[in-house]
Amino acid sequence: TAAGLTCFQVPGVPAPVQDTAPRTGERQQQEQVALAARDAMAGQLMGKLMQTLGSAGPAAAIGVCREAAPQIAAETGKKFGVAIGRTSFRLRNPKNAPPSWADPLVAAQPADPQFVPLPDGQLGALLPIRLKPECMLCHGPKDQILTEVREALATHYPPDQATGFQTGDLRGWFWVTVPAGARSPGTNAPTSANEKL
């Protein structure tokens, strides 16, 4: 469910905003799985975006999010045993609408990670995405976006709402739905929420 050019910065992962549910060992493990899945998807997607930006330019990079991002999300979900995607309060691609559990959080636009207990022992995670300078190529003010990029956006995303941002702005979130009993692949070592992208 990821198909709008979104660049990623996971800034030192601020302390999660706590809900009122007790944080059991199971809950902590689910949070670690969510963060590890986010790191994996963000790292792969950002790597592909930067490679395409360097070799083919920003207009071509739009295709990465349209075509490669859903595949990366599916592969990441399978690897970690979760459902994962990206969403925003200003969508580029309507297919990136949030799952229903995340609707109220997206409306509130939280700037910090959110963890939400869900039915059947599942955990929902909403993890912020902030824009880096290179993201302005496709997400900056319209009058500063190259003509070829504006044309590509108009072709692929006529209802685009994802321009007019500044560096450092909250662009949206990774959402992750973690089932009960989930474990990170290769949990011999603790998962890192601070993996550099």
Regions inferred by a protein language model and the residue ranges of each:
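Short Cys/His-rich local motifs and their 1-3 flanking residues in nucleic-acid-associated proteins
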Residues: G140
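Short, cysteine/histidine-rich loop/knuckle motifs that typically chelate Zn2+
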Residues: L137
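Bacterial N-terminal signal peptides
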Residues: T1-G4
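Extracytoplasmic c-type cytochrome modules immediately beyond a signal peptide or single-pass transmembrane anchor
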Residues: C7-E134, D143-L197
